[in-house]
Design a protein with these regions (language model features):
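Glycine-rich nucleophile elbow surrounding the catalytic serine of serine-hydrolase chemistry
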Residues: 148-158
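Hydrolase active-site cap/lid region
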Residues: 158-217, 266, 271
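Short beta-strand immediately N-terminal to the catalytic nucleophile in serine-hydrolase-like folds
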Residues: 146-148, 177, 230
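Alpha/beta-hydrolase fold nucleophile elbow
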Residues: 139-150
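An N-terminal hydrophobic leader/cap segment in hydrolases
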Residues: 16-49, 56-59, 63
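C-terminal catalytic histidine-bearing segment of alpha/beta-hydrolase fold enzymes
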Residues: 241-284
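Membrane-embedded segments
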Residues: 51-133, 142, 154
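Short beta-strand/loop motif that positions the catalytic acidic residue
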Residues: 221-223, 228-235
């Protein structure tokens, strides 16, 4: 019976992996649980279109700071792999009180965005969002910072590293919060956690593309781009060794902040680390 279950599990895993790994890395939630205006937060919906005509849904949040009158800059926020912007936006809109605008995109299949997520598709969506953010920041003559959390952080590294030279010049900083260093590496670690799948960790992980992994692109980031890495060493979802790995490979100027407690992507929910981020942004 155990052998039959193992064979069935292996077949299901192989099927999921060979179909683009979307079900393994992406857990979208369709629709929205609510909108910012229900909480009294000003925002504007933004609609983008992919090269294959998918409609993507996003939100832009203006600065809420009274002084200075002009915003400090624009943060392009790439969220994690689960749910959608209606559950993620509060994780970054606090910074609008410090004078920053925030732009947050839902990848294909998330929220009101059309399509089905895949590694390649999500990276394409992130690039569509980057082009919008660059145009918005340029229009207002504001610095642009790209900030990604979890899989959004992994996406952000590869996104910025592969943007065109003129686009890279418009980016003033990159923040990577609790990201993994490689798709294949994190898949192997997760397969290793269960006795049902540990024996298949290597053969199955090799079916996953590493083309978009941060560790393969970190050295291609623009020269002198300020980098900030954050990770909790008690993160049970993505070990902090992943952030340490890409941090070590990155060029200066770079900063690494590590918490000694807290769960996955919880650092920026704490006042201490929010202050650290604001100080870092002020130094750009």
């Amino acid at each position: 019976m155990v052998k039959i279950l193992l064979k069935l599990l292996l077949a299901l895993l192989m099927l999921g992996l060979l179909q683009g790994c979307g079900s393994l890395f992406y857990w979208p939630e369709e629709g929205l649980r609510g909108t910012p205006d229900q909480l009294g937060i000003e925002y504007q919906p933004v609609n983008l279109k992919t090269s294959n005509n998918l409609n993507l849904h996003a939100w832009w949040f203006p600065s809420r700071a009274e002084e200075p009158a002009k915003p400090q800059g624009l943060i392009y926020y790439l969220h994690g792999n689960a749910e959608n912007i209606s559950t993620h936006f509060m994780g970054m809109t606090w910074i609008t009180n410090h004078g920053w605008e925030v732009f947050i995109l839902d990848y294909r299949g998330y929220g009101l965005s059309e399509g089905k997520p895949s590694i390649a598709g999500v990276h394409h969506d992130a690039y569509m969002g980057l082009k919008w953010a660059i145009a918005k920041a340029k229009e207002q003559q504001l610095p642009l910072v790209v900030l990604g959390q979890s899989i959004g952080g992994a996406t952000a590294v590869t996104l910025v590293a592969n943007a065109r030279a003129e686009e890279q010049q418009q980016i003033s900083g990159l923040v990577v919060d609790s990201a993994f260093s490689g798709y294949r590496r994190i898949a192997r670690e997760k397969l290793n956690e269960s006795w049902l799948t540990w024996a298949f960790q290597y053969p199955l992980s090799w079916t996953i593309t590493d083309r978009y992994s941060p560790e393969k692109h970190i050295k291609n980031l623009p020269a002198n781009l300020p980098l900030l890495f954050l990770h909790s060493c008690t993160d049970s979802v993505i070990p902090c060794s992943h952030s340490q790995r890409i941090y070590q490979q990155a060029a200066e100027p770079k900063t690494y902040l590590e918490a000694v407690e807290g769960r996955h992507i919880e650092m920026l929910s704490q006042l201490k680390w929010r202050r650290e981020l604001v100080v870092w942004l002020e130094g750009l």
